[in-house]
């Protein structure tokens, strides 16, 4: 735990929307009188029919969560139409291509035209309110148009990260029974093409075998690369939008109508379709965007995430556009053409607020300061971090080298399920401690409990729960509300269990210590160990697999796989590489194993349960305190695992 404290910067305090007194006053009201607080702040978006009650929620029983429930609104209207009178010619999106010489600016007027046309294309091909549309796209403006077009007509979008494999895409199409897919001929990342249309074709064939038939595929031409074509099913985006009108009225949506499904990893193998609804989500995304980033009208905001993750949904698309900000959308990667790319983009587009992940910060820190120093970064006023806890060394580098000691850092903690930021400093209100997410946002009530569920007071180390709802909270898991209740509300009755461990210090600051369930956080992306295990076991030579995380210098957590082969087979380097490739093709490159250890057996209890605690310790090269191994069916396997570990300190 870092002992250093950085007081609120004078310059940040002077112009901040919220100082410490205001934070304390608002926070108290948000906790003591949530109905009054949220009734007031719900008005930050436009409503066709105003709500009469803000909050109607319970974390007990079937966990019904409803916010602003009798109000009518439309997300697309709030992100576009309401800005047109005053700011139609303001840049809504700055698109920076993978190639540093290609960029594009889209005004709010142009955004309106593009979104309305795409909405009309969807309607022309039979997409109705409530239908699920899968978006499998690279970081191009059309991905944003697709999300907003769905929200305009009441269709529910399911964005799938363009780095996922055809198998992963198919699983997500099948789960939400999506019949319309929007994709690209190819994506471009780091100068290399990504075969999105080809992957989509494979995924559609897999889905069809599970009786989910995709009727239409709308294809954006990005590279002009050669693609397969199914006449009658496949449609060119540029041809379709030319046939329709540039106006489409927004559908009046109930606040609790579904807005999107986003799949996230759970501790069991099947990804969960987290469902967010319309009113509460937008209020919360817009409000956190304004106050956490201390956003001022006309500023340029860059979140370097991908729209395939929740961070992209809330802080590239919905939060910034609801606030009439200029949002930067970057197609490429931080190290192409070289490791100075982020800082060059900041100078080129005069970015004021920059929000990225600790993994990127650590890898760019490793490349040395020269790449940073050749840019001025003089437009920067605020830095943010998201996706995983940031280690103090990376925080200090980000603050001192990137921000020149003049930009506050907001280290934000939240999840796919929370819709927006829950714990974070506010730049004009919060003294900073490197590595701490600091204090809860308005309306957020954290609680630490021990493994038995006993509430821990004061400075303590425990499991992080939330004891009351906030507007951005997910409402269910698509098609499986029982799983929603079981996953989040059954471990500690009446509380939302985050799955994260957390320490609270004597100042009441929160320090996230990492996952306490079977979920990995690799480069800020969640991956279920069970997902990786089932990918490994699907290989014909693998009899059993166990996957754990271990500390990784760049990614935060690396993926360590223990593999038992079928009888008569020996592990070797060639097979190790084959298995790594196999996992990549089953899930995608983000799931690429870092270490594969062949093991004759895994440590199991007599009831057959794998003792992951032991595997974690061995993966961490820390087996001095393995605890009680007497319950193991075959204690001898532990010695073999230790002898053949892949992570020896000397290695």
From Swiss-Prot:
Question: Which domain of life does this protein belong to?
Answer: Bacteria
The UniProt record gives the binding positions of CoA as: 189-192, 311, 335, 523, 584
Q: Top-level EC class, please?
A: ligase
* GO BP terms: acetyl-CoA biosynthetic process from acetate
SUPFAM superfamilies assigned to the protein according to its UniProt record, in alphabetical order: Acetyl-CoA synthetase-like
Catalyzed reactions per annotation: acetate + ATP + CoA = acetyl-CoA + AMP + diphosphate
Q: Which UniProt keywords apply?
A: Acetylation, ATP-binding, Ligase, Magnesium, Metal-binding, Nucleotide-binding
Gene Ontology MF terms in the entry: acetate-CoA ligase activity; AMP binding; ATP binding; metal ion binding
EC number(s) from the headed UniProt entry: 6.2.1.1
PANTHER family, per database record: ACETYL-COENZYME A SYNTHETASE, ACETYL-COENZYME A SYNTHETASE 1
| Binding of ATP, residues | 387-389, 411-416, 500, 515, 526
Q: Does the keyword Thylakoid apply?
A: no
- Enumerate the InterPro entries for this protein: Ac_CoA_lig (IPR011904), ACAS_N (IPR032387), AMP-bd_C (IPR025110), AMP-bd_C_sf (IPR045851), AMP-binding_CS (IPR020845), AMP-dep_synth/lig_dom (IPR000873), ANL_N_sf (IPR042099)
Question: Which family is this protein grouped under?
Answer: Belongs to the ATP-dependent AMP-binding enzyme family.
Cofactor names from the entry are: Mg(2+)
- What does the UniProt record tell us about how this protein is modified after translation? Acetylated. Deacetylation by the SIR2-homolog deacetylase activates the enzyme.
At what positions is N6-acetyllysine found?
609
Which positions carry the signal peptide feature in this UniProt record? none
Purpose: Catalyzes the conversion of acetate into acetyl-CoA (AcCoA), an essential intermediate at the junction of anabolic and catabolic pathways. AcsA undergoes a two-step reaction. In the first half reaction, AcsA combines acetate with ATP to form acetyl-adenylate (AcAMP) intermediate. In the second half reaction, it can then transfer the acetyl group from AcAMP to the sulfhydryl group of CoA, forming the product AcCoA.
What does the entry list under GO cellular component?
A: cytosol
Residues the entry annotates as binding Mg(2+): 537, 539, 542
Name of this protein: Acetyl-coenzyme A synthetase
